[in-house]
Amino acid sequence: MTEAKKSLKRTLVGKVVSDKRAKTVTVLIERRVKHELYGKIVGKSSKYHAHDETGEYKLGDIIEITESRPISKTKNWVATRLVQKAAVV
């Protein structure tokens, strides 16, 4: 087989909302889902703590996170790549 194996780990893209903790960033994932009963499109959001070994991701950056083994009590995700740098105001 010449094709690469597909990873079973989930990947999500979201915005860094906190970078105050050492080696950890908090990422806000926003998604739009259809309400089961009424059919209206509603916004849902979740916050995940992701491991950032080098501390390269800053507040406002759009990053990709990948599911991993538990690193601590609340960290099960690792920041893998920078999608978009935060805009300087």
From Swiss-Prot:
Keyword rRNA-binding listed? The answer is: yes
Q: Name one GO molecular function term.
A: structural constituent of ribosome
Pfam families from the UniProt entry = Ribosomal_S17
Gene Ontology cellular component list: cytosolic small ribosomal subunit
Annotated keywords? Ribonucleoprotein, Ribosomal protein, RNA-binding, rRNA-binding
UniProt family annotation: Belongs to the universal ribosomal protein uS17 family.
PANTHER family for the chain: 40S RIBOSOMAL PROTEIN S11 FAMILY MEMBER (PTHR10744), SMALL RIBOSOMAL SUBUNIT PROTEIN US17M (PTHR10744:SF1)
Name of this chain's protein: Small ribosomal subunit protein uS17
Q: Which organism is it from?
A: Albidiferax ferrireducens (strain ATCC BAA-621 / DSM 15236 / T118) (Rhodoferax ferrireducens)
Output the lineage of the source organism: Bacteria, Pseudomonadati, Pseudomonadota, Betaproteobacteria, Burkholderiales
